[in-house]
Design a protein with these regions (language model features):
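S-adenosylmethionine
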Residues: 1-230
């Protein structure tokens, strides 16, 4: 079934209109998509892509344009950058990829700006010691590195991972590599006590628990109460 672009734009607009300090874009996206019963799987994916393209390329957009036009412009910029990243001058990327206040606090390098504008990889966290078997089961995946990093897999296949048996069986979680590194750096041991002071929706806490073999005490807290309620 063809993707209905007008429908995608309408839903993406609802997400952006709903997003605020108390409802970050990822939460607003989940809430709106939960309410949308008539979208195809492809339209769900395209809506997510449109929302995050809008925020990723916000520094290039004209705020006086109607929101649907801004979203379309962001999608066009995203496609150009994917195909020809060198067509964006380094000084332009450094200037527009982050808000002005960021440049007052830290140096914005071309490498960082390029990374911010690139589509993120999809990272999975396998159960401890199960990275190799999960990679064989999924196919189209590769480990982040040797040793402990072998349980962190970058997935580049077409499957909806939330629907496959391995996910439903709890064999892996979807978790960004930087978040996985937190647990590996902590390297908790079974029987220890740890406090996750920025628990969010629990991904890092679950990783700590897995590394502790579910033996010990784990406290979790977060400034955003709604994240803990999830």
């Amino acid at each position: 079934m063809a993707i209905r672009h007008d429908q995608v734009l309408a839903v993406a607009r609802r997400v952006i209109d709903r997003a605020d300090r108390e409802h970050p874009a990822d939460l607003a996206l989940r809430l709106v998509l939960r309410e949308e019963r008539g979208l195809t799987r492809g339209e769900y994916a395209r809506t997510s892509e449109a929302v995050f393209a809008y925020y990723r390329w916000h520094g290039w957009l004209k705020e006086t344009d109607p929101l649907p036009d801004q979203i379309n412009s962001a999608l066009e910029l995203m496609e150009v950058f994917q195909n020809e990243p060198g067509s964006f001058p380094e000084d332009e990327l450094c200037d527009r990829a982050v808000p002005a206040w960021v440049k007052e606090e830290i140096e914005v390098t071309p490498g960082w700006a390029n990374a911010l504008q690139s589509l993120p990889s999809l990272w999975l966290r396998a159960k401890k010691g199960q990275g190799a078997s999960l990679m064989q089961s999924l196919g189209l995946a590769e480990p982040a590195g040797p040793g402990d990093l072998s349980d962190a897999l970058r997935y580049f296949g077409p499957e909806d991972l939330f629907r496959i048996p391995d996910f439903r069986a709890g064999t892996f979680e979807l978790q960004d590599l930087s978040s996985q590194m937190v647990g590996l750096i902590c390297a908790p041991k079974p029987g220890e006590t740890w406090w996750d002071a920025c628990a969010g929706e629990g991904g890092k806490a679950l990783h700590l628990s897995d590394l502790m073999e579910n033996k010990g005490l784990l406290w979790v807290s977060d400034r955003a109460e709604w994240r803990l309620r999830k």
